[in-house]
Amino acid sequence: MDSNTVSSFQDILMRMSKMQLGSSSEDLNGMITQFESLKLYRDSLGEAVMRVGDLHSLQSRNGKWREQLSQKFEEIRWLIEEVRHRLKITENSFEQITFMQALQLLLEVEQEIRTFSFQLI
Protein backbone atom coordinates (compact mmCIF):
# COMPACT_ATOMS: atom_id res chain seq x y z
CA MET A 1 0.00 0.00 0.00
CA ASP A 2 1.43 3.36 -0.90
CA SER A 3 2.22 5.89 1.81
CA ASN A 4 -0.65 8.20 0.78
CA THR A 5 -3.22 5.45 1.30
CA VAL A 6 -1.67 4.50 4.65
CA SER A 7 -1.75 8.09 5.86
CA SER A 8 -5.31 8.48 4.53
CA PHE A 9 -6.46 5.47 6.54
CA GLN A 10 -4.63 6.67 9.65
CA ASP A 11 -5.93 10.22 9.29
CA ILE A 12 -9.55 9.16 8.77
CA LEU A 13 -9.45 6.65 11.63
CA MET A 14 -7.97 9.26 13.97
CA ARG A 15 -10.57 11.86 13.02
CA MET A 16 -13.46 9.40 13.23
CA SER A 17 -12.32 8.34 16.69
CA LYS A 18 -12.53 11.98 17.84
CA MET A 19 -16.11 12.45 16.65
CA GLN A 20 -18.95 12.49 19.11
CA LEU A 21 -22.13 11.51 17.34
CA GLY A 22 -24.38 11.18 20.37
CA SER A 23 -26.25 7.91 20.65
CA SER A 24 -24.63 6.58 17.50
CA SER A 25 -21.13 6.28 18.98
CA GLU A 26 -21.44 2.47 18.96
CA ASP A 27 -22.18 2.60 15.23
CA LEU A 28 -19.17 4.84 14.68
CA ASN A 29 -16.93 2.49 16.68
CA GLY A 30 -18.21 -0.37 14.50
CA MET A 31 -17.34 1.62 11.38
CA ILE A 32 -13.85 2.32 12.72
CA THR A 33 -13.34 -1.37 13.47
CA GLN A 34 -14.48 -2.33 9.97
CA PHE A 35 -12.21 0.31 8.41
CA GLU A 36 -9.25 -1.17 10.30
CA SER A 37 -10.21 -4.70 9.28
CA LEU A 38 -10.61 -3.63 5.66
CA LYS A 39 -7.19 -1.96 5.69
CA LEU A 40 -5.54 -5.14 6.99
CA TYR A 41 -7.35 -7.30 4.42
CA ARG A 42 -6.41 -4.96 1.57
CA ASP A 43 -2.78 -4.97 2.72
CA SER A 44 -2.67 -8.78 2.88
CA LEU A 45 -4.20 -9.12 -0.61
CA GLY A 46 -1.68 -6.65 -2.00
CA GLU A 47 1.18 -8.60 -0.44
CA ALA A 48 -0.22 -11.87 -1.81
CA VAL A 49 -0.27 -10.44 -5.33
CA MET A 50 3.36 -9.34 -5.00
CA ARG A 51 4.60 -12.80 -4.03
CA VAL A 52 5.15 -15.19 -6.91
CA GLY A 53 2.98 -18.29 -6.74
CA ASP A 54 1.11 -17.03 -3.73
CA LEU A 55 -2.24 -17.96 -5.27
CA HIS A 56 -1.56 -21.61 -4.45
CA SER A 57 -0.54 -20.91 -0.87
CA LEU A 58 -3.51 -18.56 -0.48
CA GLN A 59 -5.86 -21.28 -1.70
CA SER A 60 -4.28 -23.94 0.49
CA ARG A 61 -4.32 -21.71 3.58
CA ASN A 62 -7.88 -20.66 3.04
CA GLY A 63 -10.00 -22.77 0.73
CA LYS A 64 -12.77 -20.26 1.11
CA TRP A 65 -10.84 -17.18 0.01
CA ARG A 66 -13.39 -16.34 -2.70
CA GLU A 67 -16.15 -16.42 -0.11
CA GLN A 68 -14.04 -14.21 2.15
CA LEU A 69 -13.47 -11.83 -0.75
CA SER A 70 -17.21 -11.66 -1.39
CA GLN A 71 -17.79 -10.92 2.30
CA LYS A 72 -15.26 -8.06 2.17
CA PHE A 73 -17.06 -6.55 -0.81
CA GLU A 74 -20.31 -6.72 1.17
CA GLU A 75 -18.60 -4.95 4.07
CA ILE A 76 -17.28 -2.27 1.72
CA ARG A 77 -20.75 -1.72 0.25
CA TRP A 78 -22.23 -1.47 3.75
CA LEU A 79 -19.55 1.01 4.82
CA ILE A 80 -20.09 3.09 1.68
CA GLU A 81 -23.83 3.27 2.37
CA GLU A 82 -23.24 4.08 6.04
CA VAL A 83 -20.74 6.82 5.21
CA ARG A 84 -23.12 8.27 2.59
CA HIS A 85 -25.93 8.27 5.15
CA ARG A 86 -23.74 10.01 7.74
CA LEU A 87 -22.69 12.53 5.14
CA LYS A 88 -26.33 13.36 4.37
CA ILE A 89 -27.38 13.85 7.99
CA THR A 90 -24.40 15.71 9.43
CA GLU A 91 -24.24 19.49 9.45
CA ASN A 92 -20.80 19.72 11.04
CA SER A 93 -18.21 20.67 8.41
CA PHE A 94 -15.43 18.70 10.16
CA GLU A 95 -17.58 15.57 10.01
CA GLN A 96 -18.62 16.26 6.41
CA ILE A 97 -15.00 16.53 5.29
CA THR A 98 -14.07 13.39 7.22
CA PHE A 99 -16.93 11.37 5.76
CA MET A 100 -16.29 12.66 2.21
CA GLN A 101 -12.66 11.58 2.49
CA ALA A 102 -13.70 8.25 4.00
CA LEU A 103 -16.08 7.69 1.09
CA GLN A 104 -13.38 8.50 -1.45
CA LEU A 105 -10.95 6.17 0.31
CA LEU A 106 -13.51 3.34 0.42
CA LEU A 107 -14.14 3.66 -3.31
CA GLU A 108 -10.39 3.61 -4.01
CA VAL A 109 -9.82 0.59 -1.77
CA GLU A 110 -12.76 -1.25 -3.35
CA GLN A 111 -11.16 -0.74 -6.76
CA GLU A 112 -7.74 -1.87 -5.49
CA ILE A 113 -9.20 -5.03 -3.95
CA ARG A 114 -11.01 -5.78 -7.22
CA THR A 115 -7.74 -5.35 -9.13
CA PHE A 116 -5.86 -7.61 -6.69
CA SER A 117 -8.58 -10.26 -6.76
CA PHE A 118 -8.58 -10.38 -10.58
CA GLN A 119 -4.82 -10.89 -10.48
CA LEU A 120 -5.27 -13.79 -8.06
CA ILE A 121 -8.05 -15.53 -10.00
From Swiss-Prot:
Keywords: Host nucleus, Host-virus interaction, Transport, Virion. Signal peptide: none annotated. It is found in: Virion; Host nucleus. The keyword Transport applies. InterPro entries: Flu_NS2. GO terms for cellular component: host cell nucleus; virion component. It holds the Pfam family Flu_NS2. SUPFAM superfamilies: Nonstructural protein ns2, Nep, M1-binding domain. GO terms for biological process: exit of virus from host cell nucleus through nuclear pore. A motif (Nuclear export signal) lies at residues 12-21, 85-94. It comes from the Viruses. Average number present in a viral particle is estimated to be 130-200 molecules. HAMAP family: INFV_NEP. Belongs to the influenza viruses NEP family. Interacts with protein M1. May interact with host nucleoporin RAB/HRB and exportin XPO1/CRM1. Mediates the nuclear export of encapsidated genomic RNAs (ribonucleoproteins, RNPs). Acts as an adapter between viral RNPs complexes and the nuclear export machinery of the cell. Possesses no intrinsic RNA-binding activity, but includes a C-terminal M1-binding domain. This domain is believed to allow recognition of RNPs bound to the protein M1. This is Nuclear export protein. It comes from Influenza A virus (strain A/Mallard/New York/6874/1978 H3N2).
